[in-house]
Amino acid sequence: MRLSNWISGSFAVVVLALAIAVPTALAADRTRIALKPSAAFPAANGKATFKARGGERELQIEVEDIRRLRGKRVVFRVGGVLLGTARVNAFGTARIERNSDRGQRVPAVRAGTKVKVRTAAGVLIVSGSF
């Protein structure tokens, strides 16, 4: 009987430890910032999310409420370096995503790294800093 209780108790401790450890191990080091509108696009807003887990890095940037730019390309820069361009959809949203596991270049992101989204002509739409 004692052995049975010991096994049951040990099993419960292991299950509890896994329940705590697994979500912690799976939780990525994630940082999200709000992107603020420029004077030229006061209704615009956006967000940028950087995730790092093990050797994988992922960066997502989205800008919204820019309907007057529908069908046009916007330029995404991180830390002053060109990340890429995206076309503004019919809803006035443009998004770019990069993931190192897909072989894509993901720039280094630290506290203070700036994110800027501009029109193809160079007019600032939104910006923010990690």
Language-model-detected regions and their locations in the chain:
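N-terminal targeting/export leaders
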Residues: 3-9, 18-130
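Eukaryotic membrane transport/trafficking proteins
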Residues: 13-15
